[in-house]
Amino acid sequence: MSKQLIYSGKAKDIYTTEDENLIISTYKDQATAFNGVKKEQVAGKGVLNNQISSFIFEKLNAAGVATHFVEKLSDTEQLNKKVKIIPLEVVLRNYTAGSFSKRFGVDEGIALETPIVEFYYKNDDLDDPFINDEHVKFLQIADDQQIAYLKEETRRINELLKVWFAEIGLKLIDFKLEFGFDKDGKIILADEFSPDNCRLWDADGNHMDKDVFRRGLGELTDVYEIVWEKLQELK
């Protein structure tokens, strides 16, 4: 399968395929935090992220969620449907943590009565600012119907993920999703789902996600390996 590099990101490289509607995503051994300010090469991270994300997307596909995932090709590669990415990070919070706690001056780990969905404008030059529905419409990113769908689909995905992670003894604190338009103009889930873009705590409150790297709490791959081993219990 011939391929040409079309995009190189912080965590993945994207390549063309012989089918114009399909791409290959290759996961890197690179860890970044604070929008790339902190950056390190972490051996084995790409393999773990690809394993975890492929597993989660397969389960989401089976549960009826429309995603870009087609199949896992190798240890670090997966075949995906090509999408036009919507320049929004859709964040869902089940508990207070991270920037939410800092923004509102509250402790981490407080359960939210109703999960909160937030939008962040995907723009590195602007440091991905927090925006609301009106900003989304002003920037012509999405209309009212599309905004409602993004929120509804994110909440539906959350209900699935919470159950799966609870079954393996992990609490889903929050996560970030990205969506895109497929060749038919349908909004589908894209990007990845791994400890890179979610917060997971175990029963003792230990971080099982990229906060280990952000906050210097331990070895990233050790934690990701534990998450991967636990996920396989769901099979």
From Swiss-Prot:
UniProt EC number: 6.3.2.6
GO biological process assignments: 'de novo' IMP biosynthetic process; cobalamin biosynthetic process
Enzyme class: ligase
UniProt xrefs under PANTHER family: MULTIFUNCTIONAL PROTEIN ADE2, SI:DKEY-6E2.2
InterPro entries reported in the protein's UniProt record: SAICAR_synt/ADE2_N, SAICAR_synt_PurC, SAICAR_synth, SAICAR_synthetase, SAICAR_synthetase_CS
Gene Ontology MF terms: ATP binding; phosphoribosylaminoimidazolesuccinocarboxamide synthase activity
Keyword annotations of the record: ATP-binding, Ligase, Nucleotide-binding, Purine biosynthesis
Gene: purC
Family matches, as Pfam families: SAICAR_synt
Entry keyword annotation includes Ligase: yes
Protein name from the UniProt record: Phosphoribosylaminoimidazole-succinocarboxamide synthase
Associated pathway: Purine metabolism; IMP biosynthesis via de novo pathway; 5-amino-1-(5-phospho-D-ribosyl)imidazole-4-carboxamide from 5-amino-1-(5-phospho-D-ribosyl)imidazole-4-carboxylate: step 1/2
